[in-house]
A protein has these predicted regions:
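Substrate-binding/active-site clefts of carbohydrate-active enzymes
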Residues: 1-34, 55-61, 78-79
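The substrate-binding groove and active-site-proximal loops of carbohydrate-active enzymes
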Residues: 2-21, 36-46, 103-115, 168-179, ...
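Short clusters of hydrophobic/aromatic residues that line enzyme substrate/ligand-binding pockets
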Residues: 9, 98, 149, 220-222, ...
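Active-site-proximal helices and loops of the catalytic beta/alpha 8
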Residues: 27, 37, 42-137, 190, ...
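Surface-exposed helix-capping loop/turn segments at secondary-structure junctions
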Residues: 35-37, 197, 241-251
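Substrate-binding clefts and catalytic carboxylate motifs of secreted carbohydrate-active enzymes
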Residues: 122-212, 227-228, 242-243
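Carbohydrate-binding surface patches
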Residues: 253-256
């Protein structure tokens, strides 16, 4: 990635696999013993299938219900990377993935797209993914790799042309902030009512703004949260916990 602090490793090297996966005190096994529930594999496309298979097996030996989720931005059922079709969902690799297609569909819909296109996008994922994968998707609206949801839902196209200093200090004007907040509530409702696990990027629930990395990674706004938005997210969490249908019910889109 051109970042000198990130080491380039050979994932097929035996000593590296022992350190990360196989040894009794490997990274994967040690943290599972200490209470981790599973692992999210950053940029799963960069990891060989054989490496993911060994990691999955080692995690299962340590904790039978360990969850292995991959960062895949596209439809992971037919992903091709480095000219090879990946086998993520053919058993023994990923339990599920980050649901970037849902995120893309939400923003497309709320920024002027059609409900039909949103439904088609979700039906495509449902048809392509195994049921257990679909119901364990990591449903995201914001992540550390994307501009803040609130910013994306209120910014104009021209404002993306601002220089780095302008983007670093940008805040939505009051009129567009109100529109963006309404859209974010709609996005959250969709996120919390779709099959999968709604996953909040810290600060989104508090109304945090910011363009792309590093402006989307500021510290949490302790003492300056949008209390109305925070209460809205808390209520969504309560409803999600109370209504089992939202976790394992069937999904059906209806024309109105």
């Amino acid at each position: 990635w051109g970042i000198y602090t990130l080491p380039q490793v050979n994932e097929t090297d035996g000593s590296y696999q022992n350190y990360i996966i196989e040894d009794e005190d490997s990274v994967v096994r040690r943290w599972l013993r200490l209470g981790a529930s599973g692992w999210r594999l950053d940029v799963a496309d960069e990891l060989p299938d054989s490496f993911i298979q060994k990691l999955n097996a080692a995690a299962r030996r340590e904790k039978s219900d360990a969850l292995i989720i991959g960062e895949v931005w596209e439809d992971a059922s037919n992903k091709i990377s480095y000219s090879e079709r990946r086998r993520y969902f053919q058993g023994g690799e990923l339990d599920s993935v980050m649901n970037y297609p849902l995120r893309d569909a939400i923003f497309g819909f709320l920024n002027g797209g059609t409900a039909e296109h949103f439904a088609e996008s979700m039906e495509c994922i449902r048809e392509n993914y195994p049921r257990d994968v679909f119901y364990n998707l990591m449903n995201v609206v914001g992540t550390h790799d994307t501009a803040r949801a609130l910013t994306l839902l209120g910014v104009t196209e021209n404002e993306w042309e601002m220089d780095r200093n302008g983007r670093a200090h940008y805040q939505l004007p009051p009129d567009r902030l109100e529109i963006a907040l309404r859209r974010l509530r709609m996005a959250a409702v969709i996120q919390f009512t779709m099959p999968g696990s709604p996953t909040i990027y810290y600060g989104d629930e508090a109304g945090q703004q910011g363009f792309e990395d590093p402006f989307n990674r500021q510290t949490y706004p302790w003492g300056h949260e949008n209390q109305e938005l925070l209460a809205f997210y808390r209520r969504l969490c309560e409803i999600r916990a109370e209504e089992q249908t939202l976790a394992d019910g069937d999904l059906q889109f209806s024309d109105t």
